[in-house]
């Protein structure tokens, strides 16, 4: 008897997780094709990591100038529902019919009423380190991430607000002329049904504190690349000027150390793909601000792989940036002058040398976000050995997760620069649109048949299924295993493991196999 192909109806909407440039691009592509999109962003505003940078390589565009219009497009799009201060907490179902639960934390500010005048922040008595500036500046307990924030509304940090923690203050409520403060807002749980999911949760910068030889955290003038990026931003902690944290004066001699946390067997063996180029970009900004400054880049290999990147590299050399091929082994601070003394090897000269610098910049790489493991478990997506979310096939299905209907975009899958993140986001959106546009998806008849009379409800198959295609359900007086035919790939793990023989394959049954053996033996 031939096996019959089934089809299931698709919920014609999509969920995009992450409000950085990749998530924004994916959401706009899907919505522009006529489908409802729910964009979930953990923070109070869109923008992601790109929103923290001042300029982008190799064109030296203003990052906000090209990012902000897209953020506004998301907020104004009639088919995009933006959920900020929100995170995914539960997911079930399969391609075409995912059921998800979103936790939306209270902002304590009415987005519709808030005019972003800033009076509340001026009067707020609480100061805490500003995570946007990597702790180089402070912010208030009621704050806005940027003047370009979307939505353009303040948010109250519940962990540091005096009223929410101790029941005192409420000064922001008293001074707000728009009456936008609302301490009665509660956490919401939003349940959605979607046909496709795009995961674009981004990355975190590597924390170089464990590299004790570089003195990050001990020496004020040892900073990370992202910290220097914030200095170059006119809205950053130094108003766009690159300054020594110890003195507040422009540095005369700067060293960039490449591959910090990347291409290092102690931490991450992979190349983060952006560090060479952002170091070159920042070196040019330093030379623009102070042409007399000496800038050195200590590198292992310069990887200028993108369009216009090699030319950008050559431009920095022409500007007087010096490149030294070799690894810096240690940094120590002169107790009198406070200069940083670097010991390094110049592999081209074959000698070990020392030199002193005013400012040292650690070009840290990209690592998986802290919540990547949580997202992986909720959605059933495996991670590769480097901790990033794993694609279904590195060559043929680079945008697809192992779970059908879930797609990966940006640095959630592997370190990327902005052009590659945007390109993959559009690719993920195109893949997500296929089931949405079809309205129904065909299901191959690969799943096993569960004999409910023999099934004892032990749950062995549920624990072993690599695709989470089985679950225990109560049917009458019995608990039995049930197969989600869309999730099932027909691997046969449950058939082999079932102690009662209740799980049987649709193909290659015992009778069929014995018949083939009998025929072959004649």
Model-predicted segments: where are they?
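Residues forming the flavin
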Residues: 1-522
């Amino acid at each position: 008897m031939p096996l019959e192909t089934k089809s299931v109806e698709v919920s014609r909407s999509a969920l995009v997780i992450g409000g950085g440039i990749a998530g924004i691009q994916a959401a706009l592509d899907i919505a522009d094709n006529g489908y409802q999109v729910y964009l979930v962003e953990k923070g109070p505003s869109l923008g992601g990591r790109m929103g923290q940078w001042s300029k982008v390589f190799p064109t030296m565009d203003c990052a906000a100038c090209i990012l902000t219009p897209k953020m506004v497009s998301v907020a104004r799009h009639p088919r995009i529902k933006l959920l900020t201060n929100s995170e995914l907490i539960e997911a079930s179902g399969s391609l075409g019919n995912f059921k998800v639960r979103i936790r939306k934390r209270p902002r304590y500010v009415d987005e519709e009423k808030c005019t972003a005048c800033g009076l509340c922040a001026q009067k707020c008595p609480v100061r805490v380190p500003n995570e946007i500036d990597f702790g180089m500046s402070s912010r208030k307990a009621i704050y806005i991430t940027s003047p370009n924030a979307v939505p353009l509304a303040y948010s109250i940090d519940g962990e540091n607000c005096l009223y929410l923690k101790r029941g005192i203050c409420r000064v922001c409520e008293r001074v707000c002329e728009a009456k936008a403060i609302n301490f009665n807002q509660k956490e919401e749980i939003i349940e959605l049904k979607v046909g496709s999911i795009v995961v674009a949760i981004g990355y975190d910068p590597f924390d170089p504190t464990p590299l004790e030889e570089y003195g990050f955290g001990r020496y004020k003038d040892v900073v990370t690349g992202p910290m220097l990026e914030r200095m170059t931003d006119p809205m950053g902690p130094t108003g766009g000027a690159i300054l020594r944290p110890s003195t507040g004066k422009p540095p005369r001699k700067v060293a960039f150390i490449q591959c910090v946390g990347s291409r290092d067997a102690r931490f991450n063996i992979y190349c983060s793909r952006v560090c060479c180029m952002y170091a070159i970009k920042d070196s040019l900004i330093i030379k623009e601000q102070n042409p007399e400054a000496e800038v050195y880049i200590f590198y292992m290999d310069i990887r200028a792989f993108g369009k216009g990147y090699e030319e950008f590299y050559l431009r920095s050399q022409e500007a007087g940036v010096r490149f030294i091929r070799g690894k810096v082994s240690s940094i120590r601070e002169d107790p009198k002058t406070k200069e940083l003394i670097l010991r390094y090897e110049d592999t081209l000269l074959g000698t070990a040398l020392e030199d002193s610098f005013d400012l040292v910049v650690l070009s840290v790489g990209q690592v998986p976000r802290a919540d990547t493991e949580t997202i992986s478990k909720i959605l059933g997506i495996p991670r590769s050995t480097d901790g990033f979310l794993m694609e279904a096939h590195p060559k043929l299905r680079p945008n697809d997760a192992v779970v059908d209907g879930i797609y990966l975009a940006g640095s959630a899958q592997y370190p990327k620069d902005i052009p590659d993140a945007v390109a993959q986001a559009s690719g993920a959106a195109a893949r997500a649109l296929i089931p949405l546009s079809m309205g129904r998806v065909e299901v191959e008849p690969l799943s096993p048949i569960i004999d409910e009379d023999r099934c004892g409800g032990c749950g062995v198959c549920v624990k072993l299924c690599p695709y989470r295609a089985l679950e225990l359900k109560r049917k009458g007086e019995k608990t039995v295993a049930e197969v989600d035919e869309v999730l099932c790939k027909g691997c046969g793990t449950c058939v082999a493991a079932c102690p009662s023989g209740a799980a049987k394959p649709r193909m290659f049954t015992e009778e069929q196999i014995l018949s083939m053996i009998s025929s072959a033996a004649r």
